[in-house]
């Protein structure tokens, strides 16, 4: 008995792994950028930091997954956008620190290697990298029979970006009187899906709920997370932004205070928040308290910017999209976020 056959009998298909690598090469090639060294398949991905032209470089890293949104991708057998979610969760955190994403690595673990499915997954990762301007320089697909079911998989990513030391965004520049500008989310993004799945547990996904404006439920639930790099990076380069909040798990209540010092607070005008239809549907069909929605979801704002009043018009000018003036920074009295 050959070693290959013995391994196959244990549930690991080495040939399928090789096929995945061949299938994803064309997707990885789309993400090429200046600074990438070496080719896919080496023991480690390499990047030449000098190619960025940054004078005082500070590396900023982030890692994340997509939570139980993966379970809906598996349920609806749609795998070509979940990779973008994974990239977005990592690079949006990096941009919130003022850094430009440079490269990304992904990790997929599964019970049975399916080359067609995982090509779809990596195609989504590559699309996310293209949108973020990051190179996909490495990754791992681990076949783990017994750990996962044959149709199950998990997905995680790791991103590294660079910032000029003087342009780092760490909350120290945010001050009382700053204006809070919201950039629209594309949907639920990648948080709160344990609750989302409970609310819609008995739905097929093909439903046309009146709140969803003619879209099938499954398409709305799997709408990929928006990547904010192209929008935010020019603002960072012009040093127009005092603080950035990536609105992820914990919604407004948990994430907005991460933008500023402990003696400040955010006053949010709820009427100016562009609440998306899916959040109205979740509140209605899930019987969720209205105030709790802001503790869980992004409510239609995926990225929040703290901007000095004199810079607001310039920021709006640079952003080729609707910009929502949803609040301001105030002195903290009790709560770090006050929703009016």
Curated annotation (Swiss-Prot):
<dbReference type="InterPro" id="IPR004733">
    <property type="entry name" value="PurM_cligase"/>
</dbReference>
<dbReference type="InterPro" id="IPR036676">
    <property type="entry name" value="PurM-like_C_sf"/>
</dbReference>
<comment type="pathway">
    <text>Purine metabolism; IMP biosynthesis via de novo pathway; 5-amino-1-(5-phospho-D-ribosyl)imidazole from N(2)-formyl-N(1)-(5-phospho-D-ribosyl)glycinamide: step 2/2.</text>
</comment>
<dbReference type="InterPro" id="IPR010918">
    <property type="entry name" value="PurM-like_C_dom"/>
</dbReference>
<dbReference type="GO" id="GO:0006189">
    <property type="term" value="P:'de novo' IMP biosynthetic process"/>
</dbReference>
<dbReference type="Pfam" id="PF00586">
    <property type="entry name" value="AIRS"/>
</dbReference>
<protein>
    <recommendedName>
        <fullName>Phosphoribosylformylglycinamidine cyclo-ligase</fullName>
        <ecNumber>6.3.3.1</ecNumber>
    </recommendedName>
</protein>
<dbReference type="GO" id="GO:0046084">
    <property type="term" value="P:adenine biosynthetic process"/>
</dbReference>
<dbReference type="GO" id="GO:0004637">
    <property type="term" value="F:phosphoribosylamine-glycine ligase activity"/>
</dbReference>
<keyword id="KW-0658">Purine biosynthesis</keyword>
<keyword id="KW-0547">Nucleotide-binding</keyword>
<dbReference type="GO" id="GO:0005829">
    <property type="term" value="C:cytosol"/>
</dbReference>
<dbReference type="Pfam" id="PF02769">
    <property type="entry name" value="AIRS_C"/>
</dbReference>
<comment type="similarity">
    <text>Belongs to the AIR synthase family.</text>
</comment>
<keyword id="KW-0436">Ligase</keyword>
<keyword id="KW-0963">Cytoplasm</keyword>
<dbReference type="GO" id="GO:0005524">
    <property type="term" value="F:ATP binding"/>
</dbReference>
<dbReference type="InterPro" id="IPR016188">
    <property type="entry name" value="PurM-like_N"/>
</dbReference>
<dbReference type="InterPro" id="IPR036921">
    <property type="entry name" value="PurM-like_N_sf"/>
</dbReference>
<keyword id="KW-0067">ATP-binding</keyword>
<dbReference type="GO" id="GO:0004641">
    <property type="term" value="F:phosphoribosylformylglycinamidine cyclo-ligase activity"/>
</dbReference>
